[in-house]
Amino acid sequence: IGIIAAITPFNDPLNLVAHKLGPAIAGGNSVVLKPATVTPLSALKLAECLLEAGLPEKVLSVVTGYGNEIGDALVSDDRVRMISFTGGVEAGKKIMKKIGLKKVGMELGSNSPVIVMNDCDLGPAVESCVSGAFWAVGQNCIGVQRIYIHEDIYDEFKNQFVARTKQYKTGFQLDEETDMGPMINEKEAIRVIKWIDEAVEMGAACLTGGTREGSLVQPTVMENMPPGVKLDCQEIFGPVVTLYKVSTLDEAIEKSNAVNYGLHGAIFTSNVNHAFHAIKHMDVGGIVINDSTDYRVDLMPFGGVKNSGL
């Protein structure tokens, strides 16, 4: 291809950089990497390691700075032949308007749904969904944001889920006893609380959490979410998950698909027919069976549909 501009987000500052550099270099290309403004150090260290290992200097350049300065210059430069971007939908749309006739790969956001059927193994489903919702403080494009639970087990699932969430220890993330640390900055924490408050004003119920101290937002569980509010249809990118009661698998799938995102979906069930029905009808790039949406290994295909990727 030639020169590839790789632009990465803050939430996985080493893994996502490696994802872009490895295939590009293996394919015989040179890369100009623009890591996230707030998390550049791991990218710089990885670049140092690659150079020390013998990578030719002109194969990789790392440029740090603000996206609206460095990123705009990179994506509009005619010498760059491909853009590889991971980040938010709005930033992705802005890049698309500036790149001209270049190849492009985009991994964007999501609002990941999980379906919990009444024939599932409830305990592991609860544990997996709690972990999937609050891992990385919810700052994860495949983190669990919506859970559609069959009405037969809704109350039991809810009680176990809320109880397990309340057990989470929050605080300094380098403390080994901490389950969940702060968000990337206080500005984002304020935004998350604003979305929660807006949902409550519209009739949603906050079962636990919903508060913050500085950039630390307590893990939050919601229910009775009105359709169309931000928490229902947009990507929160924070430690907030909403529970929904459904009567059938088809109802769960229909509601799962009723957003403009489609990265990962998941279903908990012991019925293989339910699993294959979800695989066929959920409008997402990947479906996880009997684990949460927050599952990905580096060797598996990964990508989304609708506003989740290109």
Regions inferred by a protein language model and the residue ranges of each:
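Short, solvent-exposed beta-strand edge segments and adjacent coil->beta transition regions
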Residues: 2-3, 111, 142-144, 177-179, ...
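ALDH superfamily catalytic-core signature
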Residues: 54, 82, 90-226, 249-250, ...
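Conserved C-terminal structural/oligomerization subdomain of aldehyde/semialdehyde dehydrogenase
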Residues: 80, 115, 166-169, 196, ...
